[in-house]
From Swiss-Prot:
It comes from Stangeria eriopus (Natal grass cycad). The lineage of its organism: Eukaryota, Viridiplantae, Streptophyta, Embryophyta, Tracheophyta. It is a single-pass membrane protein. HAMAP family: PSII_PsbT (MF_00808). It comes from the Eukaryota. Found at the monomer-monomer interface of the photosystem II (PS II) dimer, plays a role in assembly and dimerization of PSII. PSII is a light-driven water plastoquinone oxidoreductase, using light energy to abstract electrons from H(2)O, generating a proton gradient subsequently used for ATP formation. GO terms for biological process: photosynthesis. This is Photosystem II reaction center protein T. The keyword Plastid applies.
Length: 35
């Protein structure tokens, strides 16, 4: 069960870092207005 917990923590940390960098730097993809 410990492996599952460690994997969950690792994925959560990577997700938070990814979103932090994504929101910090504006996406270079041209926005069409919808999404």
């Amino acid at each position: 069960m410990e492996a599952l917990v460690y994997t969950f923590l690792l994925v959560s940390t990577l997700g938070i870092i990814f979103f932090a960098i994504f929101f910090r730097e504006p996406p270079k993809v041209p926005d069409r207005g919808s999404k």
